[in-house]
């Protein structure tokens, strides 16, 4: 049997003699699966943490929420303070956030036998705002693209890709808002701003440990329950952890990390996954954090210092170090704001007018053009910025 001609894919080879068929070349040279190959939908990494606040009609596009600062908090700054002796003090929050024994004892609101006008405190509240923005895009197509394209389900496939694209845009908007809303920002090493980031600004076990202490002091809740061991595999017990999001560029840095005793700090997910639930994209744990790799994680290209030739083993752009975020999001730190939604997901509004009478007008008198549009509302409101933390680090190649 003659082999197919690689230079003429449309040529039909006669099995017996290997001569071209008198019918002529074939127009369809490949077997097309009826169901086209479609890229897997990108996972909603940040969306899994968000609730959606449903914005009612006729109340504008802005939502406001009041947040009351606790009495014993340094942020509770007011002019109502009177101490136990009746003297006016700077702030009406007693000892605020202090944990010094001497300070706390000296500012306790003691009372004498006759009482009196003493120990007056005050309270403060702040307004949190979220605003709705409308987004959308559209595509156009012709009647002939529906009639003659080799994919009989072209319209369905393209429509599905439009919806996936809108979902990915929403996820990107949410990621940007979270990065900009972090109330705790840390730089490893000596850097204090982006322009000072160099090869020494690499995240370490100590950096993560101290970040966790900051979040604990901010009363940030831990979003996962304690994982218990199983008898199936050699499982390590992971305490209640916080999700930490980073890009795949940081995997070499994380897996090379050592703890304070010189042992590997990274615990791979298979060591503990059988004992409980895991996050989408989770690859392991370090100290109190669950490491979640988001392939769509953004970063700041070339925002650091100029690359040192003696320390060039890190990602850079235009000969400047790139900065990669490690984002920690505690439970109930934020919400997204939706309009006409079910309270759980962003709702997309889709219009698809096929070519014909519905689209025929003076600009398209023959009705040969159709269109599909998609629009949605997106809004974001942070409840507790001090519960969102960000480490800015370089990443090893």
Curated annotation (Swiss-Prot):
Question: Carries keyword Ribonucleoprotein?
Answer: no
Signal sequence span per UniProt?
Answer: none
Q: Where in the cell is it found?
A: Virion
| Annotated region described as Disordered, given as residue ranges | 1-24
Keyword set for this entry?
A: Capsid protein, Virion
Q: Predominant location of this chain? A: virion
Q: Which domain of life is it from?
A: Viruses
Q: Which Pfam families match?
A: Phage_capsid_4 (PF25209)
Give a GO cellular-component term: viral capsid
Quote the function comment for this protein.
Answer: Assembles to form an icosahedral capsid.
Report the protein name in the record.
Answer: Major capsid protein
Whose protein is this, by species? Pseudomonas phage KPP21
Q: Top-down, what is the taxonomic lineage of the species of origin?
A: Viruses, Duplodnaviria, Heunggongvirae, Uroviricota, Caudoviricetes
